[in-house]
Regions:
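Divalent metal-cofactor coordination and adjacent catalytic microenvironments
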Residues: 1-208
Length: 208
């Protein structure tokens, strides 16, 4: 998606006659820099290892957002218990072999998303503790994240990338249009310190 509309050009210091292809290319550079498909609302799926003896995980793409008519940002949610290593089984009164017979570890369990405590801005999900006190080992989450309205700093960054491109000798600034792939080729130099600072809050978290 384009992060600037034609009606925004003058507001952000661009010529009103700027071709939308410049904005399209600059928006693609922003997506690549932020390691996201888009900063708009999008659906993601992540399979995440649960930290030992904790019942929380953090999603990579923020903020989590609810898409009507849903009542939660989570679309589907599954989790499973891991097979403990030697000496880690916490219930001496119940043998691990007994638990395995009833498929406690290793099996995926569907969880009602409405039972999860969600922090939309941090992306943290807190799971209820199992009746036996067991912790999940891994979770698979399908969720919605992004912005319905593109934040102003992202729009400023988009305009700045276009300005940087138009000031780059290697680009054909005589043409009103710019090839997207050509502009992306120069992406490393077009994303200057100012742009990096503006986009820092919108980067995907962890290794996404």
């Amino acid at each position: 998606m384009n992060y600037l509309a034609t009606t925004d050009y003058l507001t952000y210091g661009l010529d009103a006659a700027t071709d939308p292809s410049w904005i399209t290319a600059a928006s693609a550079i922003i997506d690549a820099h932020c390691r996201r498909m888009t900063l708009g609302v999008n659906q993601y799926q992540e399979r995440v290892k649960m930290p030992p003896e904790l019942n929380t995980v953090r999603m990579s793409y923020l903020p989590l957002v609810t898409v009507a008519p849903a009542t939660t940002p989570l679309v589907t949610l599954q989790a499973r218990y891991g097979i403990p290593r030697r000496g880690e089984w916490p219930f001496p009164e119940m043998s691990l072999e007994f638990a395995l017979v009833f498929s406690l570890p290793g099996m995926w369990t569907t969880i009602d998303p409405t039972t999860i405590d969600i922090s939309p801005n941090s992306g943290e999900l807190t799971f209820p503790v199992n009746a036996l006190g067991l912790f999940f080992n891994e979770v698979d989450v399908v969720y919605n994240a992004g912005w319905n309205t593109i934040p102003v700093p992202v729009q400023v960054a988009c305009a700045q990338i276009v300005k940087n491109a138009q000031a780059t000798p290697g680009l054909n600034v005589k043409s009103s249009r710019i090839d997207r792939m050509r502009l992306e080729y120069f992406g490393g130099t077009l994303v200057d310190d100012t742009v990096r600072s503006l986009l820092a809050p919108y980067m995907a978290q962890k290794g996404a």
